[in-house]
C-alpha cells in the first residue's frame, strides 16, 4: 500500500469527522435558540455526517490493510461498502427532512432570533467549503471512492447551508413558509445525491470496468508495442486505490518463451508507469491459437 495514499485518505476521514462534530454542536445551539426547521434539517444532517464519517474512517483504515492469505486481492472493496453505507445514512436523513418540511409547511411557525441561526450557518458554510476543497484535492491524488463519497455528501451540505441562509433571511422578513419550503428542497436534493452515491458504490462492488479514457490510455501503450501481433480480452476493474488490468497478447508462434516473457515484462513496466500500483496480468498467446475473429480486438 502506498504510504502517501494511506496518509491522505486517513487525514481526509479524520478531518471530516472533526468538522462534522464541531458543526453539530454549533447547530444544536442555533436550533435551540431559533426553532428553525431548516436548522433542524441541518442539525440532523450533521448528526448523520458524524455517523457516516466515523464509519468512513473505520472502513478506510481497514481498506488500507495489505493483502493477506484470506484476501489475496487486498481490502479495497471496503471503500465501496463505506460509500454504500453512507448512501443509506443520507437517504434516511433526507426522508426525515422531507417529512418534517411537509409538516411545517402545513403549520408554519414563527422563528426566534433568526440572526443567531444565520451566523452559525455562515460559519458552517465556510467550514464545509474548506473541507470540500481539501477532500477534492485528496480525491484528485488518490481516487479514493470512500473520500469521494464523503466529498459528494459535504458538497450537498454546501447547497443546504446556502439555502438555510436564504430561508432564515426570508423568515426574518416575515415569510414564514420559506423555512419549511427550503427544508423540502434540501431534503429532495440530498435524497438524489444519496441515490447517485449508492449506485456508484454498487457498480464498484460489481467490478465495473475502468473509465473509457483509462481504457484508451491502456490501448495506446499496447497496440504499437514491439514484438506483439495484437492484443485482445482486455478486462479491468478497480478495488480501492488499486487498478486491476488483465489482457492477452498475440505473438509469433516461433517466438522463444524467454523472449515472449521479456516482451510481456517490459510492457507491464510501461503500463505501471502510466498506472502506478496497478495489478497487471498478461497472458501470451501464440497467434495461431487465437481465432481470427478475436485477433487484434484491442485498438487505441
UniProtKB/Swiss-Prot annotation:
Keyword Ligase belongs to the record: no
Keyword match Secreted: no
Keywords for the protein's UniProt record, in alphabetical order: Cell inner membrane, Cell membrane, Ion transport, Iron, Iron transport, Membrane, Metal-binding, Transmembrane, Transmembrane helix, Transport, Zinc, Zinc transport
GO CC field: plasma membrane
GO BP: any one term: intracellular zinc ion homeostasis
Transmembrane segment boundaries: 11-31, 40-60, 81-101, 114-134, 156-176, 182-202
Matches recorded under Pfam families: Cation_efflux, ZT_dimer
GO molecular function, one term: metal ion binding
Membrane topology: Multi-pass membrane protein
Catalyzed chemical reaction(s): Zn(2+)(in) + H(+)(out) = Zn(2+)(out) + H(+)(in); Cd(2+)(in) + H(+)(out) = Cd(2+)(out) + H(+)(in); Fe(2+)(in) + H(+)(out) = Fe(2+)(out) + H(+)(in)
Compartments where located: Cell inner membrane
Binding-site positions, Zn(2+): 45, 49, 153, 157
Reported function: Divalent metal cation transporter which exports Zn(2+), Cd(2+) and possibly Fe(2+). May be involved in zinc and iron detoxification by efflux.
Protein family: Belongs to the cation diffusion facilitator (CDF) transporter (TC 2.A.4) family. FieF subfamily.
NCBIfam families: CDF, PRK09509.1
Oligomeric and partner information: Homodimer.
UniProt-recorded name of the protein: Cation-efflux pump FieF
Native source species: Pectobacterium carotovorum subsp. carotovorum (strain PC1)
Amino acid at each position: 500500500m502506498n504510504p502517501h495514499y494511506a496518509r491522505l485518505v486517513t487525514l481526509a476521514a479524520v478531518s471530516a469527522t472533526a468538522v462534522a462534530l464541531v458543526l453539530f454542536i454549533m447547530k444544536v445551539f442555533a436550533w435551540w435558540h431559533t426553532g428553525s426547521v431548516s436548522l433542524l434539517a441541518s442539525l440532523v444532517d450533521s448528526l448523520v455526517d458524524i455517523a457516516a464519517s466515523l464509519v468512513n474512517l473505520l472502513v478506510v483504515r481497514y481498506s488500507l490493510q495489505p493483502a493477506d492469505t484470506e484476501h489475496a486481492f487486498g481490502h479495497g472493496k471496503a471503500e465501496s461498502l463505506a460509500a454504500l453505507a453512507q448512501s443509506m445514512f443520507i437517504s434516511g436523513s433526507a426522508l426525515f427532512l422531507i417529512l418534517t418540511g411537509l409538516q411545517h409547511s402545513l403549520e408554519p411557525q414563527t422563528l426566534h432570533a433568526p440572526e443567531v441561526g444565520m451566523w452559525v450557518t455562515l460559519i458552517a458554510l465556510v467550514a464545509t467549503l474548506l473541507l470540500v476543497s481539501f477532500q477534492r484535492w485528496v480525491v484528485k491524488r488518490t481516487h479514493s471512492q470512500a473520500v469521494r463519497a464523503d466529498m459528494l455528501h459535504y458538497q450537498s451540505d454546501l447547497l443546504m447551508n446556502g439555502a438555510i441562509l436564504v430561508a432564515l433571511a426570508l423568515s426574518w422578513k416575515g415569510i414564514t413558509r420559506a423555512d419549511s419550503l427550503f427544508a423540502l428542497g434540501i431534503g429532495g436534493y440530498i435524497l438524489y445525491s444519496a441515490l447517485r452515491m449508492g449506485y456508484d458504490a454498487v457498480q464498484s462492488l460489481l467490478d465495473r470496468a475502468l473509465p473509457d479514457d483509462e481504457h484508451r490510455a491502456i490501448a495506446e501503450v499496447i497496440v504499437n508495442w514491439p514484438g506483439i501481433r495484437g492484443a485482445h480480452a482486455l478486462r479491468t476493474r478497480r478495488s480501492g486505490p488499486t487498478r486491476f488490468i488483465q489482457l492477452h497478447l498475440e505473438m509469433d508462434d516461433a517466438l522463444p518463451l524467454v523472449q515472449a516473457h521479456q516482451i510481456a515484462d517490459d510492457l507491464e513496466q510501461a503500463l505501471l508507469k502510466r498506472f502506478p500500483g496497478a495489478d497487471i496480468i498478461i497472458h501470451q498467446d501464440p497467434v495461431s491459437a487465437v481465432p481470427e475473429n478475436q485477433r487484434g480486438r484491442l485498438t487505441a
